[in-house]
Amino acid sequence: MDHAIWLPYCQMKTARPPEHVVRSEGVMLHLADGRQLIDGIASWWTACHGYNHPKIVDAICQQAREMSHVMLGGLIHQPATHLADRLSRMIPGHDNRVFFCDSGSVAVEVALKMASQHWINQEIVGKNRFVCFQNSYHGDTAGAMSICDPVDSMHSHFKGFLLEQFPTTIPKSEQEFKAFKDFLLERRDQVAGVIIEPLIQMAAGLRFHSVASLKGIANLCRELGFILILDEVATGFGRTGSMFAFEQANLKPDIVCVGKGLSGGSVGLAATIATQSVYRPFHTDSWDHALMHGPTYMGNPIACAAANASLDLFEKEPRLEQVQMLEMWLSGYLEPLKAHPRVVDVRCKGAVGAVQLEEDVPLQSAIDFFVDRGCWLRPLRDVIYVAPSFTIERPQIETLCSAIREYVDTQ
């Protein structure tokens, strides 16, 4: 490759040359050679309003002229305080606290540290491990890797230095919930919290679980006194049809991790939001009780300005209604593929449509196939999926879904 970039999730020696993007607008990627691609995955599910939305661009430019960055160590600024207040009010509870960071993985790391230290600060020792779930993905930093699926994740090379956690399956039936409760009780003195991606495990191949399962897990956490951490990095900000996925189960989580769509897909930004009950043991006269974590660029003013503009758009534009329409379109175009002999399942929810095949999709040749048809799609193992910007129009959805149907028919 004729560049020095080490690309993510990529065997650099054998990978197809990356497409060179020179401009993005709406749902379109404009390439250096003049071609255009419909982006069907919104840059890993971030660009919820489409690329280069003028409201977000204006907010970024204005903030860059006033103050591009200042540390949050002993200093604060209006974009961060305004955003923190808004995020705090979006999560159930009174006086929630918002810790800013720069990626979803770090938001998860912070959540794990909050949950562990919550018990340490109360002199409750040994509660420093986490219950997580099969097929889960929470990020690529060390703590986040430790709570990903231990067998079927991308992190098998790193088992030697990862903390051992308590993975299990997401319960569905009454019998499975009884077994899950026993599982929790057996580890009660070791578990700091339970972490789950609500409703959709996105990076695991867009695997869905029910509102009933999510409610049942949350109820057991409440009953047994476990901290419930919801990883809404991928599912938050409208992706599943509600502002946050947990709203569909009417939950009151203890900690929520957000990212991706937080800034409307414009600037890297994430946050970990904790309830007052989690925060209280940190708020003492002891320095030892302070949370010792601080990303250099946490709460960057430009990123916070972008996020505030994005939240303004959610308030002023019919984004959730657009997501509901997207679900109808995706279901209409993709559900007929259930009858195809190569298709195992078709799943649609909110702004997500997934077609699961009998075997893994060869990534490089599949990307070639879709690029030749003017589409940017990037399959996940045995799943070809669409998770676009919420502003995408029906003809563009039809083009993406037609390309998927053609791929399933011909490959």
Identify the residue ranges that each predicted region occupies.
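Conserved N-terminal phosphate-binding loop of PLP-dependent enzymes in the Aspartate aminotransferase
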Residues: M1-Q411
